[in-house]
């Protein structure tokens, strides 16, 4: 099976600038609304607030006003389904099933511990910043403050318009005829549902044996 690149990154040392958006650049895309309407623009999806951004005629970057009415987004042949206020990318649609991935960054304010000579001694974190700049809005903490940033990828198994967290039970729900075989395959291959390559192995097995 042919898989799209999921842009998977190591969670421990990631580049905040490169992961602020799902796409590397704003690209022509289409927003599909629940009422059937479509809008086309230069689009991207922000990983901090999980909202669609677009660039208007004045080259300003804006948030889609009626975000709650979005059903799906297409950007450069990549499809993102809206599910529970998240954008889940369908990586490899095969018939009516697919593996999905949701990417996001958590930003948590933290307190610095004052060390020798009055210098801040930061507690361990994935990544630290003194401020976060988001489309012209800069969020700052008090003097000496910082953010703990962590990049996350959550995986799903999708069928039609249904999206389920990737786990043994939900794979069995999608492929009921393979229920026992899935249990054996997961155990024998030590399937890790927090790892995309591992999930792809199980998905490919199900597609080939359904």
Predicted features and spans:
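Short alpha-helical interface patches
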Residues: 22, 67-85, 168-180, 187
């Amino acid at each position: 099976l042919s898989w799209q690149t999921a842009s998977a990154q190591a969670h421990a040392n990631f580049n905040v600038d490169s992961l602020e958006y799902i796409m590397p650049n704003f690209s022509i895309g289409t927003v599909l609304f629940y009422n059937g309407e479509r809008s086309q623009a230069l689009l991207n999806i922000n990983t901090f607030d999980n909202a669609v951004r677009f660039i208007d005629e004045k080259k300003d970057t804006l948030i889609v006003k009626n975000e709650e009415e979005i059903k799906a987004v297409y950007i450069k042949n990549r499809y993102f389904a809206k599910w529970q206020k998240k954008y889940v990318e369908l990586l490899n649609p095969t018939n009516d099933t697919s593996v999905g991935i949701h990417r996001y960054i958590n930003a948590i304010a933290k307190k610095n511990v004052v060390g020798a000579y009055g210098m801040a001694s930061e507690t361990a974190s994935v990544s630290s910043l003194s401020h976060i700049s988001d489309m012209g809005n800069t969020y700052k903490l008090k003097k000496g403050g910082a953010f703990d940033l962590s990049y996350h990828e959550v995986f799903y198994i999708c069928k039609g318009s249904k999206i389920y967290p990737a786990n043994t039970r939900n794979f069995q729900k999608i492929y009921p005829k393979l229920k026992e075989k899935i249990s054996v395959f997961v155990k024998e291959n030590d399937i890790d549902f927090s790892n995309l390559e591992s999930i792809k192995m199980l998905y490919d097995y199900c597609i080939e044996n359904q």
